[in-house]
C-alpha cells in the first residue's frame, strides 16, 4: 500500500503540466519541479517570405496535443563581430563573443515568434495569478528570452506568498524587425519588432487564463531595449492600451531606458541605413526595393545587416535599427508624446544603473583630445547646433573626476575623454531621460531607483545591464529590488509590500523637496534625491530633438 502511494506521488510530481488555450487546444509543458514551463509556443505565423518586415500575423495552426518543452530559436541577430570597429580592443571583442549572452542566442532563425510561460508548480486554470511579461534587451539588435531564465523570480514569488506567472515574448531584431525608410512607412510596416511584442501581449490576454493567470493583472517589464519597448507600449496609439475593450497591461517596469531619441521612420539616418542595405544587396535597380529585399536569402540579408553600424560601433548609440515615430502607432516624437500626456495611465517603476554609458563609450577609445571629443559629439548628434555642443561640453567637461564611472575621482580614466563620453551617452539615453519621463508623467503612482551596487568595480563601475544578472542569478540588495519589490509591485501595485528595509518613496518632480529615489548599494538600500547633474539635464533636454538619431 505504501509503495503504491509512493509511486502515485512520484507519478503525480513527474506528470507533464497541461494548459488549454482559448481556442480549445490543449498543450503540454515541462515539469521542472521548481516550476512548470511551456516553452516555444508559436503566437504568430513565421515572418518569412512575403511576411518579412511586415506586421505579424496571428498563428493560425492547431497546437492541440503538442508538447512545448524547449525554447524556440532566437530571432536573427546582428553579429557583433560585424559591427565592431578596429578601435575596440580585440580582447574585449573576444570576451563578448564568448560570453553567456552571445552563446545563449544561438541557434537563430527568421521563424522565431514564440512565447514562453513559466508558472509555479501545481498552478491550474482559475488560479488567477498576476502575470509579469518580460521584454528582453539588446539594443534592438541582439537578444533572446533564452539568455536569462525566470526560475529565480518565479520561485521567489512563491516564497513571498505572492506567486506570479512569468511570460517572455520573442520579437524580430535589427533590419528584420526595425527597418526604416520611406518605403517601409508607405507600406505601413514600421516597428515590426514592437508589433511582435504587442501581438504577444494580445496572445496573453486571450490565453493566459488557461495557464492560471489573470489577464487583468499583467505587468510589462523589460531592460534596456526592453525597457524602451515598455515605454513605447505606454505611448502606443496615443496611450490606448486596450484590446477587445480591456487593458493589455495594468502596470509597467522599466530597467534602463525610457523614450527612444529617434527621428521619424522616414528620417535622414533611417533612410540612409535602408539605402545602404538596398545597395549592398544589389536591390538598387529593382522597381520594388522592398520586394527585392524580401526575396533575399536570410543569410544575404543578415550579411548586409552586419555591414551596418551596431550599438558598439564608433557612434554607438546612434543605432541603425530602433523604434521610430511613424505617424501611426507611435504618432509623434516620444518626448513630445510624454510632454503632451499621450500615454497609458498606469503605475510605473523606472530606474537605472549609475554608470550606464561605459559599455557604449568603450568604442570611443581613440577619442583622446578636446578636438576628438567635439568631433565625436558632432558625428553622433547630427541635429545638434553649435550652441548645443558648447552647452554639452560645459556640462560634461573633460575633468575626469566628473565623468563615469561617477564618484571615482581620477580613477578608471582609460583615456582623457572616455569618462566624459560615458557620462554623456549614459545620461542622454538612460539616466537623465528617466528623470525627464518622471518630470512629465502624471499617469499614476511612479517609483524610481538608481543602483550604485558595483561602484567599487574598477573601470566598469555599476555598468549597464548588471541588474539582470542580480535579477536572475544572484542575491543581495539588487536582487531584493529586481525580484521582491518588482513582484510586490506586479501583485499589489506597490513595491513596499515586499517588506523592504526602507520605505520606497513615490517619485516626485526633481525640483521638489524630499527624497524621491530608491538607491541600491552594496551595503543595502537607502533613499536620496533625484537632483544630480542638473547642468547636464538642461543641456540635453532643453530641446531633446537636437539629440535624436
From Swiss-Prot:
Keyword line = Disulfide bond, Glycoprotein, Hydrolase, Lipid degradation, Lipid metabolism, Signal
> Which processes are annotated in GO (biological process)?
lipid catabolic process
Give the residue range of the signal peptide.
1-15
Disulfide bridge positions per record? 75-112, 283-292
- Determine if Hydrolase is one of this entry's keywords: yes
Write down the chemical reaction(s) this protein catalyses: a triacylglycerol + H2O = a diacylglycerol + a fatty acid + H(+)
- EC number(s) per entry: 3.1.1.3
InterPro entries attached to this UniProt entry = AB_hydrolase_fold, CarbesteraseB, Carboxylesterase_B_AS, Carboxylesterase_B_CS, Type-B_Carboxylest/Lipase
Q: Where does the UniProt entry place glycosylation sites?
A: 329, 366
Q: Name one Pfam family in it.
A: COesterase
Per its UniProt record, what SUPFAM superfamilies does this chain match?
alpha/beta-Hydrolases
Where are the catalytic residues?
224, 356, 464
Q: Name one GO molecular function term.
A: triacylglycerol lipase activity
Hydrolase in keyword set: yes
- Its EC top class is hydrolase
PROSITE patterns for this protein: CARBOXYLESTERASE_B_1, CARBOXYLESTERASE_B_2
Q: Which PANTHER family match?
A: CARBOXYLESTERASE
Q: Of which family is this protein a member?
A: Belongs to the type-B carboxylesterase/lipase family.
Q: What is this protein called?
A: Lipase 5
The taxonomy runs: Eukaryota, Fungi, Dikarya, Ascomycota, Saccharomycotina
Amino acid at each position: 500500500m505504501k509503495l503504491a502511494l509512493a509511486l502515485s506521488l512520484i507519478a503525480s510530481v513527474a506528470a507533464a503540466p497541461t494548459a488549454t488555450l482559448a481556442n480549445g487546444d490543449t498543450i503540454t509543458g515541462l515539469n521542472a519541479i521548481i516550476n512548470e514551463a511551456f516553452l516555444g509556443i508559436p503566437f504568430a505565423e513565421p515572418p518569412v517570405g512575403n511576411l518579412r518586415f511586415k506586421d505579424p500575423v496571428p498563428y493560425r495552426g492547431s497546437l492541440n496535443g503538442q508538447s512545448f518543452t524547449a525554447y524556440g530559436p532566437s530571432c536573427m541577430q546582428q553579429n557583433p563581430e560585424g559591427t565592431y570597429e578596429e578601435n575596440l580592443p580585440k580582447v574585449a571583442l573576444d570576451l563578448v563573443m564568448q560570453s553567456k549572452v552571445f552563446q545563449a542566442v544561438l541557434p537563430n532563425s527568421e521563424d522565431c515568434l514564440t512565447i514562453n510561460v513559466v508558472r509555479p508548480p501545481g498552478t491550474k486554470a482559475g488560479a488567477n495569478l498576476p502575470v509579469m511579461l518580460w521584454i528582453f534587451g539588446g539594443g534592438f539588435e541582439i537578444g533572446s528570452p533564452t539568455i536569462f531564465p525566470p526560475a529565480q523570480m518565479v520561485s521567489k514569488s512563491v516564497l513571498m506568498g505572492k506567486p506570479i506567472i512569468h511570460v517572455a515574448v520573442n520579437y524580430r531584431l535589427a533590419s528584420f524587425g526595425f527597418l526604416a525608410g520611406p518605403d517601409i512607412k508607405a507600406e505601413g510596416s514600421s516597428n515590426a519588432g514592437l508589433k511582435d511584442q504587442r501581438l504577444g501581449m494580445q496572445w496573453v490576454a486571450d490565453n493566459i487564463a488557461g495557464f492560471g493567470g489573470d489577464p487583468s493583472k499583467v505587468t510589462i517589464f523589460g531592460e534596456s531595449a526592453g525597457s524602451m519597448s515598455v515605454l513605447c507600449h505606454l505611448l502606443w496609439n496615443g496611450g490606448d492600451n486596450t484590446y477587445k475593450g480591456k487593458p493589455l497591461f495594468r502596470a509597467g517596469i522599466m530597467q534602463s531606458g525610457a523614450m527612444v531619441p529617434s527621428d521619424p521612420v522616414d528620417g535622414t539616418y533611417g533612410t540612409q541605413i535602408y539605402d545602404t542595405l538596398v545597395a549592398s544587396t544589389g536591390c538598387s535597380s529593382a522597381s520594388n526595393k522592398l520586394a527585392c529585399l524580401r526575396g533575399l536569402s536570410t543569410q544575404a540579408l543578415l550579411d548586409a545587416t552586419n555591414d551596418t553600424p551596431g550599438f558598439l560601433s564608433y557612434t554607438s548609440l546612434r543605432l541603425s535599427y530602433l523604434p521610430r515615430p511613424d505617424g501611426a502607432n507611435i504618432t509623434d516624437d516620444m518626448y513630445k508624446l510624454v510632454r503632451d500626456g499621450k500615454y497609458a495611465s498606469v503605475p510605473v517603476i523606472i530606474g537605472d544603473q549609475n554608470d550606464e554609458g561605459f559599455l557604449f563609450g568603450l568604442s570611443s577609445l581613440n577619442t583622446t583630445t578636446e578636438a576628438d571629443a567635439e568631433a565625436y559629439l558632432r558625428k553622433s548628434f547630427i541635429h545638434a547646433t553649435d550652441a548645443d555642443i558648447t552647452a554639452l561640453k560645459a556640462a560634461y567637461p573633460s575633468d575626469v573626476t566628473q565623468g563615469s564611472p561617477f564618484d571615482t575621482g581620477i580613477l578608471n580614466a582609460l583615456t582623457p575623454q572616455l569618462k566624459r563620453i560615458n557620462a554623456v551617452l549614459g545620461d542622454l539615453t538612460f539616466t537623465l531621460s528617466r528623470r525627464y519621463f518622471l518630470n512629465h508623467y502624471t499617469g499614476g503612482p511612479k517609483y524610481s531607483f538608481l543602483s550604485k551596487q558595483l561602484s567599487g568595480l574598477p573601470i566598469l563601475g555599476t555598468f549597464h545591464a548588471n541588474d539582470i544578472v542580480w535579477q536572475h542569478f544572484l542575491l543581495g540588495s539588487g536582487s531584493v529590488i529586481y525580484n521582491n519589490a518588482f513582484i510586490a509591485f506586479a501583485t499589489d501595485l506597490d513595491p513596499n509590500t515586499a517588506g523592504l528595509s526602507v520605505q520606497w518613496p513615490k517619485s516626485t518632480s526633481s525640483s521638489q523637496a524630499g527624497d524621491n529615489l530608491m538607491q541600491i548599494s552594496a551595503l543595502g538600500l537607502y533613499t536620496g534625491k533625484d537632483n544630480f547633474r542638473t547642468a547636464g539635464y538642461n543641456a540635453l533636454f532643453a530641446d531633446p530633438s537636437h539629440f535624436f538619431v
